[in-house]
Amino acid sequence: GKKTWTSFSREALYDINSFLKLAVPSAVMVCLEYWSFEMLILLSGLLPKPQLEMSVLSICLSTTSLAYMIPFGLGAAVSTRVSNELGAGRSRAARLSAHVALCMSAMEALVIGSILFCIRNVLGYAYSNEGEVVDYVSSMMPLFASSTVMDGIQSVLSGIARGCGWQKLGAYANLGAYYVVGIPIAVILAFVLHFGGRGLWLGILCGICAQTILLFIITLRTDWGKQA
């Protein structure tokens, strides 16, 4: 080990500012999205039936995390592919990669969303034997399946944004979508209009839709020639 370790060198910090300009906004972009879902669980503890609401929303969050892995992988792949193609000056190839990944994510999201909707009456039993919890999970499935579809599409759009170096723009989009649109609507629906856990999830669905629309507009208006 000592023969291969040459000790730390200041050269490792060379051009660190360029790295941080991408790394920090990228971390903020991801964290803002993940934290918004965690806030739902915290807010559910303030509802009239906290144990039931927290159980159901935890089930939804666990399931959406599982379903998110496939589009997350597509997002990581398209991020690498787009950045490589743009770096090589192949703007048309980068654009084609983005379009193919978007089509794949849309088809995958529709399939997963449809499956979740079809098994809505039995999915709850994978987590709980309590009839009240299972019935509540079943009633949440239309909203949950819709959010799964939108989340799958935005995952690839986020990957395209990272591949193009739009981390800062993506962070602003996520901030606005989740903390200006999603969470406030969730709070109003859950606590003012008394929709409970459904209101919380409907609010975050509005946030996902806003995020997807913003990222889609950014991608649609991209001049791929200038990006390369």
List each model region and its residues.
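Small-residue-rich hydrophobic transmembrane alpha-helices
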Residues: V56-R120, G152-G165, L169-G170
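Helix-terminus/linker motif at the lipid-water interface of multi-pass membrane proteins
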Residues: T6, A27, C31-S62, L66, ...
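General structural feature for long, well-ordered alpha-helical segments within catalytic domains
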Residues: A12-L20, V24-A27, W35-L40, E53-S55, ...
